[in-house]
Amino acid sequence: LKEKHRGKGGTIIAGMLQAKGDYALFMDMDQATPISEVEKFLPKFSTKGGSASGRKQGYDVVIASRSGRQGAPIVRKLMAYGFMFLRSLILRLPYKDTQCGFKAFKKDSVKEIFKRLKIFNESNIVSGASVSAGFDLEILYIARKLGLKIAEVNVNWYHKDTERINPIKDSLEGLRDLLRVRINAILGKYK
């Protein structure tokens, strides 16, 4: 993959669209979720056999869920719970954790989702080390709108200290992104 530096969003999009395997995974560089956690994801994609409950899996998208967010500061936890409430109210996304940077996709799902991105796409790249909450929201909203099967899997996650968190700025950006995805949906831009 040869790309000029275009920030986290641009790098993930380019990598996902050029992925060659049957599945594509993106994860945060700090490895707060260890790569070994992907072992929990793979059975979710399988259409053979079934789970312990006897149901076939066959998911198109598998996302990580940081249950309890052990080690995260209280401010981060409060921000997460507020965001969960607004997310379910505005976008009706039923997932516990949309923001964990550990997500995997079946190959055919990648192109269907990533070619429909409107806020974060090839022509609207946000530069810098991180992207706002809208990146993951838009991906999951599109996947759900397309009727793709999405599984959420509890993973081991370790809080990594960062100075990049600004509770007020990040909360306002998150709300802005929620509204942008909702407006795009109302305008029919995710068809």
Question: Could you tell me what each predicted segment is?
Answer:
Residues 1-3, 49, 141-147:
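Long hydrophobic alpha-helices with heptad-repeat/coiled-coil character
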Residues 3-6, 10-18, 23, 35-129, ...:
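Acceptor/aglycone-binding surface of glycosyltransferases and processive sugar-polymer synthases
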